[in-house]
Regions:
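An amphipathic, aromatic/His-enriched active-site/gating alpha helix that lines ligand/cofactor pockets
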Residues: 31-44, 63-101, 155-168, 187-224
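N-terminal secretory/targeting leader peptides
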Residues: 46-50, 56, 169-174, 178-180
């Protein structure tokens, strides 16, 4: 199964308008039709609401055999009709009618292992998603000191930590008008506990890099997890 991801900021003062327009439609009387459209396309859509240091962000994921085709078809309908409404909620420059694929985050890491035990069990899993902005001027530090190490000689160890925690991690990099953002997804029987185990096993030098690049102190009390506000399979 393939996954695509996309994170959009919600402008200050627009949270209630966003809830009314987006969630009101998707969770209200249109939910059955919305769910069925995703099922017909063979994708599972999830939406998460995350509180940031300033404002909120909505994280969206689509998973299936061909989620990109569904996304492109969806944008052909949504952007011409709702461009102004979306810009009012999320800001200009986020939604690109001329090239919708360029809006999506790029998957840069996947801990999947065909031998992994969590992939062998035919059981219900859950997924969490987290957005981490990259601080201004820190994108190259993130690429060379975090991502390259995760994908290079440390990848077997990086994967093993995820497998031991019982989760599959997929990481995405998204460019936004305000900079870059990393989207992390963790899927498993208990992804919250798995994520906590990964944080606890993080080497001190890596934790320092996370602080430098994201301004996120892994040793401090963690903020509430993003809330799953829509799941087309529920």
């Amino acid at each position: 199964m393939k996954m695509i991801a996309f994170a959009v900021p919600i402008l200050e003062g627009k949270l209630e308008d966003w809830k009314q327009m987006i969630l009101g439609n998707m969770l209200g009387e249109n939910k059955k039709a919305t769910d069925e459209s995703r099922e017909y396309a063979g994708v599972q859509e999830r939406s998460y609401l995350q509180k940031m240091s300033k404002g909120h962000v909505c994280i969206l994921t689509w998973e299936g055999n061909d989620p990109l085709s569904f996304w492109l078809d969806l944008m052909k309908i949504a952007l011409p009709e709702f461009t102004d409404h979306l810009a009012d909620l999320h800001g200009r420059g986020i939604f690109k009618e001329e090239n919708p694929e360029s809006m999506l985050a790029e998957m840069v890491y996947d801990s999947k292992d065909e031998q992994s035990e969590i992939l062998k069990k035919d059981e219900k899993t859950e997924m969490i998603a987290i957005a981490l902005p990259i601080l201004p001027g820190k994108i190259e530090v993130w690429k060379t000191k975090i991502l390259d190490k995760m994908l290079g000689e440390n990848k077997p160890d990086t994967d093993a930590v995820r497998h031991a925690a019982g989760v599959r991690e997929r990481s995405f990099l998204q460019e936004t008008p305000d900079g870059h953002m990393v989207i992390l997804t963790f899927e498993g029987k208990d992804p919250v506990t798995g994520y906590s185990q990964i944080i606890q096993k993080m080497p001190s030098e890596f934790a320092e890099l996370v602080m430098e690049v994201h301004g996120f102190d892994v040793n401090a009390p963690h903020p509430p997890m993003p809330e799953l506000v829509y799941n087309s399979h529920e």
